[in-house]
C-alpha cells in the first residue's frame, strides 16, 4: 500500500505501525481433503490426514521472512455404480522460491471400498476408508463375510495423522459398508442382524470415525470425521457420519431419500457410501490449512 508521511508518523507514535519479524514460531493445523464414499452399498470415505502442532505433541515450526506456499486438498468426487470412492488430495504447507522445501504434508483421505472383491476392500490413506460389500447369497441366516477396511496414517507420520476404516459385511440377505476412519478414532464396522422372514439376515452399516477438536482459531471446532457406510437391506440402518463433518451413508430403499451425504466443506471429512447410479455416494469434504502466529494472529 501507499501511506503519507503523516499517517506513518501517527501510526508509529501510537504503536500501530506494522513491524517486521525476523523469525516467528508458527502453530499449524493442516487437514487434507476427505475421500468420497463408494457406490452400491459401499464403505464410507476416510477423513483427510490431520496434522497439528497446536496443543499437540508435534512441535511448532520456526519461519523466517520469505515466501511460503499453501495447498489446500480437495475432497474426492462422488461415485455412482459399483466402484471404489475417490481419494481426497493432499494439503501442503511449504517454503516457496529457492528454498523449495515441504514442511508439512497431510495425506488425502481414502475412497470407500466398493462392490465385489477384490475391489471391495477398503483403501489406505490419511484415514482409511470403510470396507465395501458384495452381492448376497441365498436367503437364510448364516455366517457373514467381513471385508477389511483400509489402513489410516498411510504414509506413516508421528504423531499419527489418521485412523483405520471399519470392515464391511456380506450377510446372507443384505450387505453393508464399513465406516471411514476419522481423525479421532477408527471407523465403525458393519454389524450382522437377525430378522424375521422374509428378510432373515442383513447388516447395519458402520458409522464414520469421530473427528478431532482444535481451538487453534480461538474456539473449539471439530473437523475430519469419517463417512458412514451404506446398506442394502430395507430394514437395516445406514452408517452415521463421524463428528466433525462426516457424511451419512445411503439407505435402501430410496423413494424420496437422499444420496450419500457429502463431507462438510473445509473439514476434510469423508463422504457417505452410496446405493446406485440414482443415489450416488457423498463427496469428500475439502481440507483446510490454518496458521497461528505469535499473539492472536490467525491465517
Regions found by a protein language model. Name each.
Residues 1-14, 23-299:
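Low-complexity, glycine/proline-biased repetitive segments and flexible coils/loops
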Amino acid at each position: 500500500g501507499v501511506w503519507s508521511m503523516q499517517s506513518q508518523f501517527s501510526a508509529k507514535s501510537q504503536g500501530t505501525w506494522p513491524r517486521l519479524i525476523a523469525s516467528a514460531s508458527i502453530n499449524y493445523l493442516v487437514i487434507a481433503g476427505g475421500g468420497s464414499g463408494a457406490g452400491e452399498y459401499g464403505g464410507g470415505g476416510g477423513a483427510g490426514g490431520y496434522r497439528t502442532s497446536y496443543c499437540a505433541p508435534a512441535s511448532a515450526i520456526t519461519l523466517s521472512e520469505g515466501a511460503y506456499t499453501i495447498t489446500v486438498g480437495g475432497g474426492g468426487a462422488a461415485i455412482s455404480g459399483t466402484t471404489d470412492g475417490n481419494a481426497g488430495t493432499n494439503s501442503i504447507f511449504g517454503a516457496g522460491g529457492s528454498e523449495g522445501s515441504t514442511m508439512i504434508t497431510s495425506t488425502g483421505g481414502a475412497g470407500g471400498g466398493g462392490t465385489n472383491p477384490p475391489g471391495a476392500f477398503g483403501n489406505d490413506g490419511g484415514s482409511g476408508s470403510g470396507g465395501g460389500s458384495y452381492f448376497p447369497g441365498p436367503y437364510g441366516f448364516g455366517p457373514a463375510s467381513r471385508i477389511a477396511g483400509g489402513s489410516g496414517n498411510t504414509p506413516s507420520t508421528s504423531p499419527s495423522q489418521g485412523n483405520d476404516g471399519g470392515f464391511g459385511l456380506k450377510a446372507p440377505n443384505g450387505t453393508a459398508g464399513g465406516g471411514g476412519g476419522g481423525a479421532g478414532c477408527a471407523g465403525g464396522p458393519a454389524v450382522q442382524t437377525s430378522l424375521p422372514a422374509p428378510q432373515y439376515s442383513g447388516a447395519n452399516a458402520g458409522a464414520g470415525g469421530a473427528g478431532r477438536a482444535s481451538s487453534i482459531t480461538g474456539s473449539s471446532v471439530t473437523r475430519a470425521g469419517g463417512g458412514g457406510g451404506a446398506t442394502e437391506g430395507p430394514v437395516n440402518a445406514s452408517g452415521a457420519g463421524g463428528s466433525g463433518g462426516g457424511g451419512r451413508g445411503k439407505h435402501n430403499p430410496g423413494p424420496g431419500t437422499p444420496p450419500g451425504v457429502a463431507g462438510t466443506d473445509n473439514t476434510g471429512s469423508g463422504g457417505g457410501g452410496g446405493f446406485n447410479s440414482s443415489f450416488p455416494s457423498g463427496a469428500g469434504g475439502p481440507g483446510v490449512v490454518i496458521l497461528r502466529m505469535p499473539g492472536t494472529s490467525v491465517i
